[in-house]
Amino acid sequence: MYKVLISDAMSNVADQIFNDKGIEVDVITGLSEQELINIIPEYDGLLVRSATTVTADILAAATKLKAIARAGAGVDNIDCAKARENGVVVMNTPGGNTNATAEHAFALIMAALRKIPFADETTHKGEWQKKAIKGVELSKKTLGIVGFGNIGARLSHLVSGFDVNVLV
């Protein structure tokens, strides 16, 4: 039977998916590098998010490890070169958060343009500052997007309906 360690906090759906396939799962979060080095030899798989950094030292101790899965877009917290050298497959979920992140960025842009946080704060204090909360329209504005990967491209698409000039 395979054994997987989930070393970062995430939905319990993750361990349920493994359990449904007959894979034993341990969820142990908040491990130091040394603690992970001490227990990693017993695992065939490792599931991380952002809190765990998978170093060369951890991989050197991971004698049974076959795969590392990163529940997220990047793998900058995993020593991919050392993993490859050890025959460990590294996988991630590129695009998994693209739409949610682009929509969140769009919501923040709209909130800033329309002064929504300030309007919310002052009206909750019982104040009505009509002139101070007057926002501006997004239409006919220029939006600079730094980084035009999946998220930047999706954000560009979202603002396209607002007649925005996008600079990349």
Description of each model-found segment:
Residues 6, 26, 45-121, 135:
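Phosphate/diphosphate ligand-binding glycine-rich loop within oxidoreductases
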Residues 122-130:
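A short, charged, Gly/Pro-tolerant segment at domain boundaries
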Residues 131-168:
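Rossmann-like dinucleotide/phosphate-binding beta-alpha-beta segment
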Residues 16, 37-38, 56, 60, ...:
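Alpha-helical segments flanking ligand/cofactor-binding loops in enzyme cores
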Residues 17, 104, 108, 154, ...:
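Rossmann-fold NAD(P)-dependent oxidoreductase module
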Residues 1, 65, 139-142:
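Phosphate-coordination loops involved in phosphoryl transfer and adenosine-cofactor binding
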